Structures are given as C-alpha cells and as structure tokens.
A protein has these predicted regions:
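Protease-labile, long low-complexity intrinsically disordered regions enriched in Pro/Ser/Thr
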Residues: 28-199
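Hydrophobic helical h-region of N-terminal Sec-dependent signal peptides
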Residues: 10-19
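C-terminal motif of bacterial Sec signal peptides marking the signal peptidase cleavage site
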Residues: 20-24
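Bacterial N-terminal signal peptides that target proteins for export
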Residues: 2-10
Length: 199
C-alpha cells in the first residue's frame, strides 16, 4: 500500500508577518512527491519580504517562479505583489524528497469523521478558518471515503526537510506538518496534544 502524507507548514510572526503553508507528499518508490505546498504572508503593514526555501529534495514546480527565492511586497490582507507587478494569494512550490515520517503517535479517524476532525485539529494548531478551509477542501476528497485515516502531526522532521528563511524574520515561528495514510481497520495509537502559540 502506498503511504499518503499531507504536510502543513505554518509559521507565525506576531510583529512582522505571519506565514502559513499547506502541502502534502506521496511516496513513489524511493521518493515522495510533495504536493500543493503554499506559503501565506500577513505583515502588520505593507512590507517587502524575501522568502528562501532550503529543501532537502528537488523542486519540481514553483509559482511565482522561485529563481533564487521569492521577493514580494506583502499586505496585511495577504495579497502578494512580485517584482513584475503580478499579484498572488500565496507562494507555491512542489518537489520530491525521501524524508521518513513517524506515524507511531497521532490519531486514527474514521473517513466520515475526517472533516470535523481536521476542522478542530487545524483550529487547535492555530490556523484561521480561511487557511483551514484551503487545507480541508484539497485533502478531504482523498480522505473521506477511506474506512479510516491514520493522521500524525510532525513538525520537527518537516522543519529539517523544508527550512524557510524569511526576511524580515518572524518573531514567532510555528511549523505544523500533518502526515497521513489510509487504513482498512481501526488501530489504537497514543494521541498527540495539539497546541499553537498566540498569533
């Protein structure tokens, strides 16, 4: 059975900017394809922001074009404007990597309960309703029909695999990573405690 992973990058800056990303990865032989990672920027006032990604893998797609990094003007509502005057809702990238994730702790959730679980879990991890909605509408169709989903939030490993360098630097940084795979039967695993810093 293929392993399915959903990754969530999340970083918050109370004084300068707030950064949030949504992504996923799927194992293909020795590599995993990281799907739909996005980075949101929310400064307190309009700010020029540079974002670089040190990814322990190979980038396969970026939008806007990554080049040597992203350089945008970010507004408090999250609107990003690049050097060519184009506007975006977020920064997007995809890639392949061979990271290994631990699913020994987390949650076993019935497929039919996945939407409600994600609403609560993503709220507890500090996402806004808009950010959680973006995450859920992308992943729910792949999860809700499974008998069960094994879900584990793992920020430490993902922080090492996909390091973000943001300038100006955030005051607070929170990385959230959700790994998951479908199950035919329910399993008992130790539950995780989900917390988030103030934003």
């Amino acid at each position: 059975m293929k392993k399915h992973f959903a990754k969530q990058i999340f970083a918050a800056a109370l004084a300068i900017s707030f950064v949030c990303g949504l992504s996923a990865c799927r194992e293909r032989e020795e590599e995993q394809l990281t799907l739909k990672p996005v980075i949101y920027l929310y400064p307190e006032e309009e700010t020029d922001v540079s974002v670089t990604l040190a990814y322990d893998g190979t980038l396969t797609c970026t939008y806007p074009n990554y080049k040597t990094g992203w350089h945008v003007s970010a507004k408090p509502d999250g609107t990003l404007t690049d050097e060519d005057g184009q506007t975006y809702n977020y920064l997007y990238w995809e890639g392949t990597d061979s990271a290994e994730y631990d699913l020994s702790h987390g949650f076993c959730v019935a497929g039919s309960d996945t939407a409600a679980f994600l609403e609560n879990a993503l709220r507890d991890l500090g996402l806004t309703r808009k950010e959680a909605n973006e995450f859920i509408v992308y992943w729910l169709p792949q999860m809700q029909e499974n008998p069960y989903n094994l879900i584990a939030f793992q920020s430490d490993c993902y922080t090492q695999v996909a390091q973000l360098d943001i300038s100006p630097a955030p005051d607070t940084l929170l990385r959230v990573f959700m790994a998951w795979k479908p199950l035919e039967e329910k399993v008992d695993i130790p539950a995780q405690t989900l917390t988030a810093p103030a934003r």
